[in-house]
């Protein structure tokens, strides 16, 4: 198993290093210098806004628009910090793999700019902070149910790249999809957690969670495909190896699943605005992305990833407008 010892340095840590250098490397280790952690916030924020709009329809005057936006902000910050902790965990477990892949070998741990101890202390600080924020957001209700599932899936994600999971046809994208999709439950709990049971909140957010799960499979498969040569050398398990030469058709299939699950959620919301601003925009974007993806050019997957991030940001706006329309 490719895992570093807690007391072993990945390489030699520079002898002269300022506190600013350490802070910068920890910032980069959590990917806070990139847009990637924001992907972990979309599901929870969308869910919070949609649940707020739904509650304003079912119980007019029972909840203010300002409160919903405040809860959405708390869910956003909690998810962002949690993702930072998950990035550190992933890099620690994948240390030896990252050294062999061109895109990852200069990450702070793989490059030896920080020690394992420093990384793990940073990881735990972020995890504790995210737990506190979610507990505060949910007013102490269903905190374990909100945090434990995503914690387990985050822990298992890097191990999903190992040969054991490959033998049972289980891929890391499944863990990642769950980790990024389950916060839809947290977002729903942030609005309706004290009004209805956990089971009801899960059921109402299930279609949205499925949307995000399949969306993550789609965008991560396209994105990680650019590492196919390095992953072959490192014997990394990934779902695009299952697709093989049919990778393009596989992405089309995943895009169809995303749109299907989205349709179920929007049907429950009963909003003409969301049908146009969400489903239509996503459908057009997927068609454009898939027309440009090439199995012969793995780097084309990187562009798809960025465009899907833009879709996520746009959908935050669409859900915010939906809330305002119901106010």
Curated annotation (Swiss-Prot):
Disulfide bonds: none annotated. One of its GO terms (biological process) is terpenoid biosynthetic process. It comes from the Eukaryota. GO terms for cellular component: plasma membrane. Belongs to the UbiA prenyltransferase family. olyprenyl transferase; part of the cluster that mediates the biosynthesis of shearones, diterpenoid pyrones (DPs) which are structurally diverse meroterpenoids consisting of a diterpene linked by a pyrone, and which may exhibit a range of bioactivities. This is Polyprenyl transferase esdpC. The gene is esdpC.
